[in-house]
Amino acid sequence: MDYRNQSLGALAIAIPRATKLFRQHQLDFCCGGKQTLLRAANKLNLDIDALEAQLSALQTEPHSSEDWQQQPLTNLISFIISRYHDRHREQLPELVLMAEKVERVHGEKPTCPRGLAAELSAILEELTQHMYKEEQILFPMIQRGMGSQASGPIFVMEAEHDAVGQQLDVVKQLTQNVTPPEGACNTWRALYTGINEFITDLMEHIHLENNLLFPRALRGE
């Protein structure tokens, strides 16, 4: 397979666990899923040959994940809501509370991620509104077989995906790429573990929508 000239989104669809590899190398396969592996790797000065070897190894591994290219879109929508929307609604309020505690207790330390709670609160508010619009407007259109007429709502949802991606960049800057400092307390470490889990979930969530659900819906499937 010609990996280097494939888009990150296409590779994430075709190769199980490629998303984890991309995340390890800071390759944006969700909002930036249309760029080729070669272009994305060159931007980050990554070894393209090594990446291709890793992708080849992943492609030969047995896997049991769902083939969302073949599943009905109603099934994919149900999965997105239960696996990601509901999960984000659980994750974010707890992360905000932990961030507030860390800033309150450790605010005088130079390594304290001051402003993190406010940024997470903004993500919570905007993502809650975003998911509501998907569940109340866009997803019902797709479920009624009107996906090919949903280019307007899809454009808005993709723009909002880009916006939350920019917010995640701010979170990473505030947290030294979500790396707890030496001597961080248990709450601080739990916060960063939770943020990393949230970022992984959100990237997979956006990937499924941008690179699978929306294109299939626009094709009228």
Swiss-Prot record:
Domain of life: Bacteria
Keyword Signal on entry: no
An example Gene Ontology biological process: protein repair
Cellular component GO terms, alphabetical: cytosol
Cellular localisation: Cytoplasm
CDD domains: Hr-like
A GO molecular function held by the record: iron ion binding
Pfam families cross-referenced by the UniProt entry: Hemerythrin, ScdA_N
InterPro entries per UniProt: FeS-repair_YftE, Hemerythrin-like, RIC_family
UniProt key word Iron: yes
Entry's transmembrane regions: none
Main location as per UniProt: cytoplasm
Keywords assigned by UniProt, alphabetized: Cytoplasm, Iron, Metal-binding, Stress response
Role this protein plays: Di-iron-containing protein involved in the repair of iron-sulfur clusters damaged by oxidative and nitrosative stress conditions.
PANTHER family in the cross-refs: IRON-SULFUR CLUSTER REPAIR PROTEIN YTFE
Similarity comment text for this entry: Belongs to the RIC family. YtfE subfamily.
Subunit structure: Homodimer.
Listed name of the protein: Iron-sulfur cluster repair protein YtfE
Organism: Yersinia pestis
